[in-house]
């Protein structure tokens, strides 16, 4: 049994392949002609399931016997922004690029009179195959700051300091980040399900 990732985000593909290295993983565009998926769910879990279903349903009948579609939906929830950007994290600025999203988050926080805030990341993992639909989730707590620090990672990593650390995610090594991240926690649970589904 193989896994097709329901994402074309190169950063996510690399991170997912690293964490799921015990499995045979294919990026979306290695198996299918890429297509747009409308993420109109109201929660991370709903959006993850929408993406995994869309990719699984695009496979032909033979591929459906060989593949499980796996999707991640994740984002950052900032306390002083009443939980925003949340499920809109990837398109918070309306431009869809990481730098614009980070700039908007900092500007919104400063407008409210804060230069930092408690925040948490959420990741939902959805798996869809002939055996059914499954989902897991993970959370990472910490705070966001108003100044970018570090060169690693993507998204809001350069603004987020995990609880118990004095560095942003972008200042941590890949291994350090993967050991504490919301996505890692959700994927560790997903691995248990995948091991059962991929037997035989």
Curated annotation (Swiss-Prot):
Q: Might you report a single GO cellular component term?
A: cytosol
BP GO terms, sorted: nucleotide metabolic process; purine nucleoside triphosphate catabolic process
The record's section on SUPFAM superfamilies has: ITPase-like
Q: Which residues bind Mg(2+)?
A: 38, 73
Q: Which cofactor does it need?
A: Mg(2+)
Residues at the active site:
73 (proton acceptor)
What CDD domains does the database record attribute to this sequence? Answer: HAM1
Q: Which keywords has UniProt assigned to this entry? A: Hydrolase, Magnesium, Metal-binding, Nucleotide metabolism, Nucleotide-binding
Q: Which GO terms describe its molecular function?
A: dITP diphosphatase activity; ITP diphosphatase activity; metal ion binding; nucleotide binding; ribonucleoside triphosphate phosphatase activity; XTP diphosphatase activity
- Which positions does UniProt annotate for substrate binding? 7-12, 74, 154-157, 177, 182-183
Catalyzed reaction equations = XTP + H2O = XMP + diphosphate + H(+); dITP + H2O = dIMP + diphosphate + H(+); ITP + H2O = IMP + diphosphate + H(+)
The EC number on file is 3.6.1.66
Free-text cofactor note: Binds 1 Mg(2+) ion per subunit.
Enumerate the Pfam families for this protein: Ham1p_like
Q: Which domain of life is it from?
A: Bacteria
- Which NCBIfam families does the record match to this protein? RdgB/HAM1 family non-canonical purine NTP pyrophosphatase (TIGR00042)
Q: Provide the family line.
A: Belongs to the HAM1 NTPase family.
Q: What does this protein do?
A: Pyrophosphatase that catalyzes the hydrolysis of nucleoside triphosphates to their monophosphate derivatives, with a high preference for the non-canonical purine nucleotides XTP (xanthosine triphosphate), dITP (deoxyinosine triphosphate) and ITP. Seems to function as a house-cleaning enzyme that removes non-canonical purine nucleotides from the nucleotide pool, thus preventing their incorporation into DNA/RNA and avoiding chromosomal lesions.
Assembly, in brief, is:
Homodimer.
Name the UniProt record assigns to this protein: dITP/XTP pyrophosphatase
Organism expressing this protein natively: Campylobacter jejuni subsp. doylei (strain ATCC BAA-1458 / RM4099 / 269.97)
Read off the lineage from the record. Bacteria, Pseudomonadati, Campylobacterota, Epsilonproteobacteria, Campylobacterales
């Amino acid at each position: 049994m193989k896994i097709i990732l329901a994402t074309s985000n190169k950063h996510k593909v690399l991170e997912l392949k690293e964490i799921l290295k015990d499995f045979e993983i294919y990026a979306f565009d290695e198996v299918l002609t890429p297509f747009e998926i409308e993420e109109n769910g109201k929660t991370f879990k709903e959006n993850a399931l929408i993406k995994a279903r869309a990719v699984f349903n695009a496979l032909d009948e033979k591929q459906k016997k060989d593949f499980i579609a796996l999707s991640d939906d994740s984002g950052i929830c900032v306390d002083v922004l009443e939980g925003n950007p949340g499920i809109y994290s990837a398109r918070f600025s309306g431009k869809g690029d990481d730098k614009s999203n980070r700039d908007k988050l900092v500007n919104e926080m400063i407008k409210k009179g804060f230069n930092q805030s408690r925040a948490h990341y959420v990741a939902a993992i959805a798996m869809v195959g002939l055996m059914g639909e499954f989902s897991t989730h993970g959370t990472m707590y910490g705070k966001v700051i108003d100044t970018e620090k570090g060169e690693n990672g993507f998204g809001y990593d350069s603004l987020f300091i995990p609880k118990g650390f004095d560095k942003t995610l972008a200042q941590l090594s890949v291994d350090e980040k993967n050991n504490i991240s919301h996505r890692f926690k959700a994927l560790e649970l997903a691995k248990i399900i995948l091991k059962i589904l991929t037997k035989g």
